[in-house]
Amino acid sequence: MRTLWILAVLLVGVEGHLLQFETMIIKMTKQTGLFSYSFYGCYCGWGGHGRPQDPTDRCCFVHDCCYGKVTNCDPKAAAYSYTIENGGIVCGGDDPCKKQICECDRAAAMCFRDNLDTYNYAKYWKFSAKDCQEESDPC
């Protein structure tokens, strides 16, 4: 069980209700976030700095910015509700905090899906931190 928790912590974005975000990614891309998006580019995975390297890395940058704007709750722990409808994700529930987190995760999962054609595992997975030194874009 401890191994599963450690793996969950490594998921893309590192925050939010990780298993829900992972499920969103799988449903939208048919790829697992853990193996396809953690350690990708300069922003996918733990932390982030520099300039996003491609559209997928930009999805992670925008996701990080989105979490930074979440107010009055902890994006690392709040479980939210959502459904998959007509190939998209619909966030539900009445809690504004949880809905904000869900919307951040929804946007990232949809962004990953929309950029599968430029996703470059060979080039950007385990991308070197020394290549992420340029000044970051503002959120």
UniProtKB/Swiss-Prot annotation:
Annotated S-S bridges: 42-132, 44-60, 59-111, 65-139, 66-104, 73-97, 91-102
Classification via SMART domains: PA2c
PROSITE patterns xref list: PA2_ASP (PS00119), PA2_HIS (PS00118)
Pfam name, any one: Phospholip_A2_1
Protein's UniProt name: Acidic phospholipase A2 Ts-A4
Enzyme Commission code(s) on record: 3.1.1.4
Gene Ontology cellular component list: extracellular region
Function: PLA2 catalyzes the calcium-dependent hydrolysis of the 2-acyl groups in 3-sn-phosphoglycerides.
Top-level taxonomic group: Eukaryota
One Gene Ontology term of the molecular function aspect: phospholipid binding
Residues of the signal peptide: 1-16
Catalytic activity reported: a 1,2-diacyl-sn-glycero-3-phosphocholine + H2O = a 1-acyl-sn-glycero-3-phosphocholine + a fatty acid + H(+)
One GO biological process term: lipid catabolic process
Enzyme class: hydrolase
Tissue-level expression: Expressed by the venom gland.
UniProt cofactor(s): Ca(2+)
Family that this chain belongs to: Belongs to the phospholipase A2 family. Group II subfamily. D49 sub-subfamily.
Cofactor: binding details: Binds 1 Ca(2+) ion.
Keywords (A to Z) from UniProt: Calcium, Disulfide bond, Hydrolase, Lipid degradation, Lipid metabolism, Metal-binding, Secreted, Signal, Toxin
Listed PANTHER family: PHOSPHOLIPASE A2 FAMILY MEMBER, PHOSPHOLIPASE A2, MEMBRANE ASSOCIATED
SUPFAM superfamilies tied to this protein: Phospholipase A2, PLA2
